[in-house]
Amino acid sequence: MYLVIVFLGIFYLNKFSAIINRIKKANYYVLGLSFVVFLLFVFINFYIDGNSLNADRWSAMDVTIASILNGEYPYGMKDHLGQTSSNLPALFYIGLPFYFLGDVGLLQPFVFLLISLFLFKSKIAIHKKVIVLFLLLMSPSYLWEIIAKSDLMSNIILLILFLFFWDDKFKNNYFKKPLLLSFFCAFFVLTRGIVVIPLTLFLFRGFLDSNLKTKLKFIVGFTIFSIVICLPILINLPNTETIIEHNPFNHQTKFTPKFVQILFILLPFLIALKRLKIKEKVYYLLILLSILLFVSFAIVCFKFGFDNALYKSYFDISYLGIVLPFTILYFVLDYTKLD
């Protein structure tokens, strides 16, 4: 029934696209509807008690922020489910404004509002804007992110918005502003390790085409900004044994074999050697992410059993939602009209 509703929704939105696109001020109606959804998401966020959830992304972020503000090393602290945080340092900055607003879960509604503003400002056909919002709001994985106060998909959506903004501004030369780009790359890499894959696919070819001075500026800038972003954690480092046992890299990758991690870090570099259009980059990215997630899930199932993988969080199935934003962009958006 669910799939029927989704397919019928897309079918009729396309069928009546000419009528939808001719409606006066339709863009403002879409924005207004999006704002109502935003308010609903805010209400849901405050209505649901995070401590009642069997998902701890929100509390991992909350504990990380609270620990850093209190001058403590965050990766040994326990969240409401008794787990230690795997938040990389940049998530501290993303969640900080919402921590001060009283709930880090507000990140998700505000990222949805940002998507709505992006669609409002873009020159995408009105019916395609509606399809984007329809697919997003009909996605169980996205709605789970809202209800569970998870930051995963919001993290990926922020990355996508940055990549398309950068492509729009510097389409002919991604490395025109190497220092600014190095800051954003360092920031996003320090949110989640998996974002290395899309960043490499989108930017590595441009890095190779840049001159030596630009390359050096980017490398030096990336190194300095990475250190600065990590500084609140670096100044509170405990003893070596604690760091080895409790660190975000260990927590994020403990169930995936090292050879799989290395392989999928290297593959984007090889694919990016070819000159690709932005839609082709998204296509290859979807393939890489899908294979990575499937292989990781299969390995965990083989080692620990299907029940442990699925029901005891040996594999976090919410990571499957990573492909959703890229899938929507690939199948719906007209990339020639993103400016």
Model-derived regions, located:
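Short hydrophobic alpha-helices at membrane interfaces in multi-pass membrane enzymes
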Residues: V132, L163-A186
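Aromatic- and kink-enriched transmembrane "portal" helix at the membrane-lumen/periplasm boundary
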Residues: F92-Y93, V132-I156
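Perimembrane helix-loop-helix junctions
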Residues: P198-T223
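Membrane-lumen/periplasm interface segments of specific transmembrane helices
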Residues: K215-K303
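Transmembrane-helix motifs of polytopic, lipid-linked glycan transferases
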Residues: V104-H127
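Start-transfer (signal-anchor) and selected internal transmembrane alpha helices
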Residues: M1-F43, I278-I287, L329-D339
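Intramembrane catalytic core of multi-pass membrane enzymes that act on lipidic substrates
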Residues: L31-V104
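Membrane-interface alpha helices of multi-pass inner-membrane proteins
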Residues: L96, P140-S141, K177-F204, V228
